Amino acid sequence: MKPISKTLKNGMRAIAVPTNGAASMTIMVFVRVGSRYETKDINGASHFIEHLMFKGTKRRPDTLNISKELDRYGAEYNAFTSKDMTAYYIKMDAAQTGLAVDLLHDMLFHSKYDPKEIERERNVILEEINMYEDNPRMHIEDLIEESLFPDSTLGWNIAGPREVIRTVPREKLIAYRDAYY
C-alpha cells in the first residue's frame, strides 16, 4: 500500500493510505501546532483549541450534534496535543468516509468558539491539569522536561499554566488558530 500525498490550498498536506477490502477506515488530521509554537501569554492555546473543536460548528451547533452524528455509525473519535502537533481522528465504517471528511473539515474550519463553551472548557482543562499533577508518572515527565529545557518552549506544559487557562481571551485563541490552521 503506497501512501498518496496532496498539498491543500491552505498549505496542509493530506496523506491517504488506501487499504483495499477494509470494513473500517481512519481519517486523522495532524496540524503542525503544539506548545512549542506558543508564547508565554498563550501557553496552552494549542490544547485549548483542540478541546474547542468538538464544541460546535455553524452546521453542527453543539457537542451533542457532533457526537450523535458519529455515534449513529459507531465511530471512535478523539484528538490529542503534543509539543509539536495536534491531531484529530475519526475511525468508522469505510462506507461513511465522506461523513468523516466533512465533519473534520467542519470542525477544523468552522468551529464556533462559543464564549460559554470557552468558559466551560477553562474548568475542564484546569481539572485536567490537576489530574496530570496527581499522576506521578505524568507529573515527573513534566518536571523533567522543565529541567531539561528551562529556557525553551519545549520545557513548557502542553496544557499551559493555570493563570493563562483562566484568563486567555477568546480573541487570542481565534488569532492563534487562524495563524496555524
State each model region's role.
Residues 4, 16, 35, 53, ...:
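A glycine- and charged-residue-rich anion-binding loop/surface
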Residues 21, 26-91:
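M16/MPP (pitrilysin/insulinase) zinc-metallopeptidase core fold and M16-derived inactive scaffolds
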Residues 7, 18, 65-181:
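Charge-rich, well-structured scaffold segments of protease-associated domains
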Residues 12-14, 37-40, 48-53, 107, ...:
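A broad, low-specificity signal for short, low-complexity segments enriched in glycine/proline
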Residues 1-24:
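N- or domain-start disorder-to-order transition segments that initiate the globular core
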